[in-house]
């Protein structure tokens, strides 16, 4: 039994996929068949929301003349996302949807950064989270388009200057492309976070095996260790870039729904 337990532990440490496994942190059997549990993904999403509130509280100036570092950082992110939204949509309508898009950016960014902490959990590496976001956003943009334009919203599927003979084929292609937004938006975020964390896990295990093989190999292992540190910095950049790409595409989908192009 102990050997089996030892083998299970070894498999968990060496497998790069086990870090993404959803586990119950707290499980309660309530009345009847009712089962209440807190999973690691729910726990870390809650932590992300908590950090979001804390950061906003820390950025409040309380009528101080000189802004603190938290406030300056928040204002920089605010200005960046505001510029993206107003340029993608337009200055007037962009103001309406900016609070949602800014909150979406901070939510994704914080959860991406939490996933970079060792022994934590990358919530945005799970397709159930990213697809829930992407399906909701595309559905909301579609409802917005129908609410504003009615059946004229279907003109979004008709390319400008399309020959009449090719119209059925091109409309079908545009329709499939529109439906693919549900998948591509969430897939891009989860795949980038997932692949980066898997590569870091594999490189870390490889470096650990080298550095524990002897004194000579310990110094040789400093080379891949330096690469891991550099790659971790790159992953931090990817955490910001993927959050920004997500909101840029979201702004584009809202613009398509509003302007039909």
Swiss-Prot record:
Q: What is its main location?
A: mitochondrion
Entry coiled-coil feature ranges: none
Q: Which gene encodes it?
A: atp-6
UniProt name for this protein: ATP synthase subunit a
Looking up InterPro entries in the UniProt record yields: ATP_synth_F0_asu, ATP_synth_F0_asu_AS, ATP_synth_F0_asu_bact/mt, F0_ATP_A_sf
Task: Name the SUPFAM superfamilies on file.
Answer: F1F0 ATP synthase subunit A (SSF81336)
**Subunit-structure text:** F-type ATPases have 2 components, CF(1) - the catalytic core - and CF(0) - the membrane proton channel. CF(1) has five subunits: alpha(3), beta(3), gamma(1), delta(1), epsilon(1). CF(0) has three main subunits: a, b and c.
Which cell locations does it reside in? Mitochondrion inner membrane
**A GO cellular component entry from the record:** proton-transporting ATP synthase complex
Superkingdom per UniProt = Eukaryota
Which residues are assigned to the propeptide feature? 1-14
**Record function comment:** Mitochondrial membrane ATP synthase (F(1)F(0) ATP synthase or Complex V) produces ATP from ADP in the presence of a proton gradient across the membrane which is generated by electron transport complexes of the respiratory chain. F-type ATPases consist of two structural domains, F(1) - containing the extramembraneous catalytic core and F(0) - containing the membrane proton channel, linked together by a central stalk and a peripheral stalk. During catalysis, ATP synthesis in the catalytic domain of F(1) is coupled via a rotary mechanism of the central stalk subunits to proton translocation.
- Please provide the record's keywords in A-Z order: ATP synthesis, CF(0), Hydrogen ion transport, Ion transport, Membrane, Mitochondrion, Mitochondrion inner membrane, Transmembrane, Transmembrane helix, Transport
**Protein family according to the UniProt entry:** Belongs to the ATPase A chain family.
